[in-house]
Every structure is written in structure tokens, then in C-alpha cells.
């Protein structure tokens, strides 16, 4: 909370806010102001883990909107080519900022875009804690056993607009009521 309120005792000394948190001590390398730019950074961290013979997995979180950015595909390629311990996690809430996924991306299964690079993965209900937990365990076990990346697409629900300044008027009332929103695990 100190970081979010701009205090010096925050993990980024109060300068990161909600988008640019960073803590090397906690191995949290934060968000990024450019959509999808954290993905190659996460692959670089995975490379460092492999290079140093560390038994660690780099976790890279990205939204469905980032899945149409070129650097994401470049990162998938290198993660697979170099067999890096990286877990890619897509939060698919059906909107990249204010654009519906149907207007910006061909195909329904975003995780399948990584399969062309030989990355195994799956799509799960991101609103179900147990489903997410089971998928994370499968991913961890696969990465540790095979020394290869894995991808999980989590279908979830966006309860509000993209940010405080986004009233979400591009969504119909039906989208707010169907499917029935549940507590999200993300």
C-alpha cells in the first residue's frame, strides 16, 4: 500500500504507483508502460535462471490485448528455441483496453498462438480458484521436468472499465450481467 500511496517506504520508493512497481529483493520486476513489453523481459529473466543453473521459473503475466503485439511472438520463439523455464499467463477478459477481442484478434484460443513455437499450454476458467491452482501445478511440473516454457490462458471477467477514467460505455448492460460475474482469482 505504501507504493500505491506514493510513500518512500514503498517497494519502488513511492515512484512506481500501480503500473511500475519493482522489487529486486522480492524478485518482482513489475509492470510496464508499453503493452506486452514485459514479455521479452520475462523471457530474459528465464534465460538468466537457466544460465545460472537456478531452479526457478519466470512467470510472465499479460493481457489478451498484448497477444497481438509482435514482441510477444518474438519472446515465445526465443523461450521455446532456448528451452527456457518461463510460464506465460494470459488474463483473457475479452477486452484489450476498450477494444473487444473479437474486433482485434482472429481465433478464439489465444494460448494456441504459442503452440506454433512448440510451447505446450491450456485454457482454464480463470474465475475458479481450484482450476487455476491445478493448472499452475501442472505448468510448474511440466517446466521443471522438461525445461521448456508453458502457457496458460485464463478466461476471466472484467467487472469495470480498463482504468478509473474508463466508464466502460462500449460494453452493453448484458455484458455486465451475463455471464454471471463471480469472484476472480486473478
What are these regions (language model features)?
Residues 1-82, 100-106, 111, 116-118:
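Cofactor-binding active-site loop characterized by glycine-rich and histidine/acidic residues
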Residues 82, 97-144:
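Ligand/cofactor pocket segment of small-molecule handling proteins
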Residues 176-183:
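Conserved small/polar residues in nucleotide/adenosyl-binding loops
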Residues 130-167:
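Structural signature of the thiamine diphosphate
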Residues 1-9, 49, 94, 136-147:
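Structural signal for hydrophobic packing residues in well-ordered secondary-structure cores
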Residues 25, 62-68, 90-96, 127-131, ...:
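Acidic, glycine-rich active-site loops and adjacent beta-strand->loop/helix elements
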Residues 91-92, 113-120, 163-172:
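Short acidic (Asp/Glu) and glycine-rich catalytic loops that position anionic groups and cofactors
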Residues 84-88:
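A glycine-rich helix N-cap at a beta->alpha junction
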Amino acid at each position: 500500500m505504501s507504493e500505491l500511496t506514493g510513500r518512500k517506504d514503498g517497494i519502488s520508493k513511492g515512484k512506481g504507483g500501480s503500473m511500475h512497481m519493482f522489487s529486486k529483493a522480492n524478485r518482482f520486476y513489475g509492470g510496464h508502460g508499453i503493452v506486452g513489453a514485459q514479455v521479452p523481459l520475462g523471457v530474459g529473466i528465464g534465460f538468466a535462471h537457466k544460465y545460472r543453473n537456478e531452479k526457478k521459473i519466470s512467470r510472465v503475466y499479460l493481457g489478451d490485448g498484448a497477444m497481438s503485439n509482435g514482441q510477444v511472438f518474438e519472446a515465445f520463439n526465443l523461450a521455446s528455441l532456448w528451452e527456457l523455464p518461463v510460464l506465460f499467463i494470459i488474463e483473457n477478459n475479452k477486452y484489450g483496453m476498450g477494444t473487444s477481442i473479437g474486433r482485434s484478434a482472429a481465433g478464439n484460443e489465444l494460448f494456441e498462438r504459442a503452440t506454433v513455437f512448440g510451447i505446450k499450454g491450456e485454457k482454464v476458467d480463470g474465475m475458479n480458484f481450484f482450476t487455476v491452482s491445478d493448472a499452475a501445478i501442472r505448468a510448474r511440473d511440466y517446466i521443471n521436468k522438461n525445461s521448456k516454457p508453458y502457457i496458460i490462458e485464463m478466461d476471466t471477467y472484467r467487472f469495470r472499465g480498463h482504468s478509473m477514467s474508463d466508464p466502460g460505455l462500449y460494453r452493453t448492460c448484458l455484458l455486465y450481467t451475463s455471464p454471471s460475474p463471480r469472484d476472480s482469482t486473478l
